[in-house]
Amino acid sequence: MNSKDCVVIGIAGASASGKSLIAKTIYEELCRDLGTDQIGVIAEDAYYRDQGHLSMDQRVLTNYDHPKALDHELLCTHLRALKQGHAVDIPVYSYNDHTRTDEKVTLTPKKVIILEGILLLTDPALRKEMDASVFMDTPLDICFMRRLSRDVAERGRTMESVMQQYTETVRPMFLQFIEPSKQYADIIVPRGGKNRIATDILKARIQHLLAK
């Protein structure tokens, strides 16, 4: 596969801003148009650094909302490999254990790769790998309420720990890194992942890039 045959779309924004929802919607609709074997989704979360050498007490102190917590270099390497026609083994990250597992998920080359993650647009090298980028501009208080519900229900967190993390790292890192990265987005999406007009615009852009 030649690099021009692979379109990479990056969807960034605060945690619980609607990134996964719009990525899922675009994935499902493009699968109907292009086939399920032609579209891939990569979550930035999979590239949290391995912390197997640290104790659990040390792992929970990691600032997961800082760019240094993520191995963007590996993500860039994987994107370049996919563009060159090579399959890659994506890490599997455990939210309960705060480190990578021994498992890998193999992703084969696709016509469209959809990236989604909070810090995608903070990395210049990663931005260069994207053909188009999106920032989900959802109010932070709404994101917090969604995150609180999600992390308690799906990730085994206590309400107190989620609130403490939000105060100590999530909100400060959003203001320091994530919100400023909005300037690099090609499309800014208000009102979350259910914004139908924004979804249609992004799909049209992807189809235009594929037609080149």
Curated annotation (Swiss-Prot):
SUPFAM superfamilies per UniProt: P-loop containing nucleoside triphosphate hydrolases
Coiled coil: none
Protein known as: Uridine kinase
Gene3D superfamilies: P-loop containing nucleotide triphosphate hydrolases
Location in the cell: Cytoplasm
Keyword Nucleotide-binding appears in the UniProt entry: yes
Gene Ontology biological process terms from the UniProt entry: CTP salvage; UMP salvage
Principal subcellular localization: cytoplasm
This protein's record includes keyword Ribonucleoprotein: no
Reaction(s) the record says it catalyses: uridine + ATP = UMP + ADP + H(+); cytidine + ATP = CMP + ADP + H(+)
EC number per UniProt: 2.7.1.48
Keywords assigned by UniProt, alphabetized: ATP-binding, Cytoplasm, Kinase, Nucleotide-binding, Transferase
Gene name tied to this protein: udk
Lineage, top ranks: Bacteria, Pseudomonadati, Pseudomonadota, Gammaproteobacteria, Alteromonadales
Top-level division of the source organism's lineage: Bacteria
Pfam families: PRK (PF00485)
InterPro entries, A to Z: P-loop_NTPase, PRK/URK, Uridine_kinase, Uridine_kinase-like
Family statement drawn from the similarity comment of this UniProt entry: Belongs to the uridine kinase family.
Pathways per UniProt: Pyrimidine metabolism; CTP biosynthesis via salvage pathway; CTP from cytidine: step 1/3; Pyrimidine metabolism; UMP biosynthesis via salvage pathway; UMP from uridine: step 1/1
Residues binding ATP: G13, A14, S15, A16, S17, G18, K19, S20
GO cellular component terms given for this protein: cytoplasm
GO MF assignments: ATP binding; cytidine kinase activity; uridine kinase activity
